[in-house]
Regions:
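Conserved N-terminal catalytic core of the sugar/cofactor nucleotidyltransferase
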Residues: 2-6, 14-17, 28, 32-107, ...
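Active-site metal-binding loops of divalent metal-dependent hydrolases
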Residues: 11, 109-110
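Phosphate- and divalent-cation-binding pockets in alpha/beta enzyme and binding domains
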Residues: 14, 61-62, 115, 179, ...
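A structural signal for short hydrophobic beta-strand segments in well-ordered beta-sheet cores
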Residues: 26, 143-145, 208
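Hydrophobic/aromatic residue at the end of a short beta strand that borders the catalytic acidic motif
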Residues: 106, 112-113, 172
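Arg/Gly-rich low-complexity intrinsically disordered repeat tracts
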Residues: 243-262
Length: 262
């Protein structure tokens, strides 16, 4: 079984002053709140049990917007992340909830055109990252690959070893939590997801897939605008971004109640 986690914390400082009044993941991307898009990525991949991790001041806003998930045919659980401990720390909060299941982790500001259902269905153990060819690789975590192996990941390198950016979508087995517990904070005082991924690489259990469609991390004004324009363009030729809760998404959860974990 695969569970899903949407990480929707952070201060959104690059989107001030908008994020002084709301969480950045609630800002509009074309005609829907940003968080609808990562949720849709998980839903179309067949994942129905999803946790949203956010800060104390924002969890209530997500609960008001999304509720139990019944409207979207899913079961939602909410987890509070105190402070800014990093992506890996936020993921670690879900250990009890995930149990022994595999988990798909997606950053709440990442928007994907690709359908990842095949990648999820073929995943069994270890870890898997999703890469995208970019022209400005120095802005991202960059994967060095050879054949079907990932040799390493370097965060925002001055001289990238490839043009393959590591997107904000990761698949892990339950062993990820033991790795997180062994991490030490980086120079910025956070537990880094790149360190988690490199641990799997050293074990030889990291897989990868290269995305073909549009991808954006809508964390700046420029990328937010670009994401809105691209979503609108995709709308014109398909229903890929119809979004959770639209008529094509059937409700299948019954009277599920949202769980808020603290």
């Amino acid at each position: 079984m695969m569970k899903g986690i949407v990480l929707a914390g952070g201060t959104g400082s690059r989107l001030h002053p908008l994020t002084k009044v709301t969480n950045k993941h609630l800002l509009p991307v074309y005609d829907k709140p940003m968080i609808y898009y990562p949720l849709q990525t998980l839903i179309t991949a067949g994942i129905k049990d999803i946790m949203i991790v956010s800060g104390r001041g924002h969890v209530g806003h997500f609960l008001e917007l999304l509720g139990s998930g019944k409207e979207f045919g899913i079961q939602l659980t909410y987890e509070i992340q105190e402070g800014a401990g990093g992506i890996a720390q936020a993921l670690g909060l879900a250990e009890e909830w995930v149990g022994m299941d595999n988990v798909a982790v997606i950053l709440g500001d990442n928007i994907f055109q690709d359908d990842i259902q095949g990648g999820i269905e073929s995943f069994e153990s270890g870890a898997k990252i999703f890469l995208k060819e970019v022209s400005d690789a120095h802005r991202f975590g960059v994967a060095e690959v050879k054949g079907n192996k990932v040799l390493g990941i370097e965060e925002k390198p001055k001289i990238p070893k490839s043009n393959l950016a590591v997107t904000g979508l990761y698949l892990y087995d339950a062993g990820v939590f033991a790795i997180i517990k062994m991490l030490k904070p980086s120079s910025r005082g956070e537990l880094e997801i790149t360190d988690v991924n490199n641990a799997y690489i050293r074990r030889g259990t990291m897989e990868f897939a290269v995305l073909k469609g549009f991808w954006s991390d809508a964390g700046t004004f420029e990328s937010l605008l670009r994401a809105s324009v691209m979503v609108r363009g995709v709308y014109a030729i398909s229903d890929r971004f119809a979004g959770p809760g639209t008529p094509d998404v059937e409700s299948r959860v019954g009277d599920a109640k949202p769980g808020i974990r603290e």
